[in-house]
Amino acid sequence: MVADNIDAGVAIAVADQSSSPVGDKVELPAGNYILVGVDIDTTGRRLMDEIVQLAAYTPTDHFEQYIMPYMNLNPAARQRHQVRVISIGFYRMLKSMQTYKIIKSKSEIAALKDFLNWLEQLKTKAGPSSDGIVLIYHEERKFIPYMILESLKKYGLLERFTASVKSFANSINLAKASIGDANIKNYSLRKLSKILSTTKEEDAACSASTSGSGSGLGSGSSMVSDSVSISPRDSTVTNGDDKQSSKNAVQGKRELFDGNASVRAKLAFDVALQLSNSDGKPEPKSSEALENMFNAIRPFAKLVVSDVLELDIQIENLERQNSFRPVFLNYFKTTLYHRVRAVKFRIVLAENGFDLNTLSAIWAEKNIEGLDIALQSIGRLKSKDKAELLELLDSYFDPKKTTVKPVVKGNSNNNNNYRRRNRRGGRQSVKDARPSSSPSASTEFGAGGDKSRSVSSLPDSTTKTPSPNKPRMHRKRNSRQSLGATPNGLKVAAEISSSGVSELNNSAPPAVTISPVVAQPSPTPVAITASN
């Protein structure tokens, strides 16, 4: 699917880089191994993404743990796994988009240590005769082993992991070899489980019909007596059981969500078990069924050491691939089609050992002829793709030329729809230009609503609605200085007094006259004579 290969609009999927084995294939030696189904949920399909859920399954035990990632899930991963990251205050946590509940999670190193403890316990329970564990996964393009090994290398837990786990095995190769139907294009777990369930039902129906035809003549009376002995009370109980079973079936369908890693781990184990025991009904706990399963999947199992070497090569290819980002910058700014083509070109160049510095040296020595010779050695590209890539690289390295931009083809239907929408939008804008006095029209712009309309077209607090075509004149407030300084101050005051708004202020209070204070003469000093 494109959603799985495109990560946030730019596809840099590690799973798309190379699904072919690198180097000589190291087969798993014969021995007594424990088969475990494994799967993961991640924040994306890149090697730099993180694991969100790690799950493993055996018929006797299972492991499941959610991991709190540092980055958020991209839209494709959120849609597939139905899990998203939320922030409450200073805390980040996982929340299910199905149940709307908070999911208990751990850090990546704590979850990996728990997973290693669980694997070591499985090996200990099997006894000293056990040679190790084989992890079975199911996917079209190899991605799960790379993510698990990269996480283990990050925390220095790879040696402890290789002490218990000896090999990874992809069950999709077993499905292609067992079914071999050219009409089946998608070997997903959901598709294979449906195919295997239908074949099992057909086999059960055939066996029931043959047994019924052989024993129906001799036991017909007993069958009739059994059918007659059923009472109405028993039938009501049966109906209740049917209702309960249907309810449980609906609940089971809700729980069997293939976007969950624990469900896919169990499906991977069950599908491999049924494919390897197609002759009879497989019993998961029987040693014979598990032995048949190991013998069937052993040709497709590889040692962990070879997967580690492949991971190192994938990291080198990823570095080469990222070096071409400036060349395809215009491709990533256009449509999804050109982004996918840019990813394809980058992957092919990186897998053939080219990086930006290597091609730059070739162009500096032999110009476009050297680039043409280098691209001719790539057999995966068509002649049209080689011509497009050659023109793009030459325009990038040549300073006299401008970098080629991809041509986006226009669609006539889209143009017609665009004109139709514009025509409708013009009519609607004319209708919207009419003033509306309804309260709903004035409240739809509140609380950060539609801000496309200008503020001048909104009605003010006055009773008179301004005309949309005539701008509203704002009257300046007259201060005391402007009233005394300008000669129009008396005129404005006269206009205001003549209006009916200020009729109550026409009668002024009588003026109060204050008489000036007359200074009283100061008294003259009187001489007092003393008498005997």
Curated annotation (Swiss-Prot):
Polar residues bias locations: 454-467
GO-annotated biological processes: anterior/posterior axis specification, embryo; bicoid mRNA localization; embryonic development via the syncytial blastoderm; mRNA splicing, via spliceosome; ovarian nurse cell to oocyte transport; pole plasm oskar mRNA localization; regulation of pole plasm oskar mRNA localization; spermatogenesis
GO function terms (MF aspect): protein homodimerization activity; single-stranded RNA binding
InterPro entries with a match to the protein in the record: Exu (IPR037998), Exu_RNase_H-like (IPR054362), RNaseH_sf (IPR036397), SAM_Exu (IPR040941)
Pfam families: Exu_RNase_H_like, SAM_Exu
Modified sites of kind Phosphoserine: 467
UniProt keyword Cytoplasm present: yes
Keywords assigned by UniProt, alphabetized: Cytoplasm, Developmental protein, Phosphoprotein, RNA-binding
Keyword Cell membrane appears in the UniProt entry: no
UniProt subunit comment: Component of the osk RNP complex, which is composed of at least exuperantia (exu), ypsilon schachtel (yps), aret (bruno), cup, and the mRNA of osk. In the sponge body, forms a ribonucleoprotein complex (RNP) containing at least me31B, exu, yps and the mRNA of osk; interactions with exu and yps are RNA dependent.
Physiological role: Ensures the proper localization of the mRNA of the bicoid gene to the anterior regions of the oocyte thus playing a fundamental role in the establishment of the polarity of the oocyte. May bind the bcd mRNA.
Protein's UniProt name: Maternal protein exuperantia
